[in-house]
Every structure is written in C-alpha cells, then in structure tokens.
Amino acid sequence: MNRQPMFFILIVLLFTVFSLKEFIPNTFCIHPKEGIIHLEKEHPKTFCEKDEVHVKVLSEIKNLKVQLDLDKSFSFTSPFRISLSFVVLKKQNALPEKSPRRESPIKTVRLLI
C-alpha cells in the first residue's frame, strides 16, 4: 500500500484539528519533488520557493470540517488534483436562512503556486 496518500490525509486531519483550535499552522506547504508535506504559519515575509506549493484556506467561520479528496492516480511525481470541501459543524442561528453568507460560508480558498 502506498503510504504517501495516507500521510497526506493524516496531515489534513492534523491541519483541521489545529485550525479549529486556532493553532499556529494555517498553510499546507507541499514539496512535490521531495514528497514532503508540512504545515506552516503564513507570514508576510514567507514566500513560496519555485518547487513548492502553498495551500491556505481563509475563513471567518471557526467550526469547519475540512475534507480533502485526491485523484485516484495521486503521485508526487506527476500532476494531481486536490478537491477541498467544507462543512460547517455548528449551525449559526444569527444568520437568516436565505442569507448569501449562509449559502456560501467560505470567503476565500486560495491556491498559491
């Protein structure tokens, strides 16, 4: 069994836990050539190297579950697609039922390449 997808899913789960608790890391840093994925805190002085990908999810909602789906042909040596989906865990009573913000709670999903 290939361990790279399992490792990637573990990182996603850790990222979710840290995000929900407002912990320091808030950005995935993916190094495809080395097969390394780690978490880091985005900082104004932090920038991407040319051989890495930063993925940061920005949201004003704190109670989120992040689900990450990979292509079946996932490999660090070839292009792959990442699909992120978000579920609000706690219902927000303050927003009206037909509020545009309720229908689309995520402000920004940004992929920096």
From Swiss-Prot:
One of its GO terms (cellular component) is membrane. Keywords: Membrane, Transmembrane, Transmembrane helix. Its main location: membrane. It is found in: Membrane. It is a single-pass membrane protein. This is Uncharacterized protein aq_465. The chain crosses the membrane at residues 7-29. The keyword Transmembrane applies.
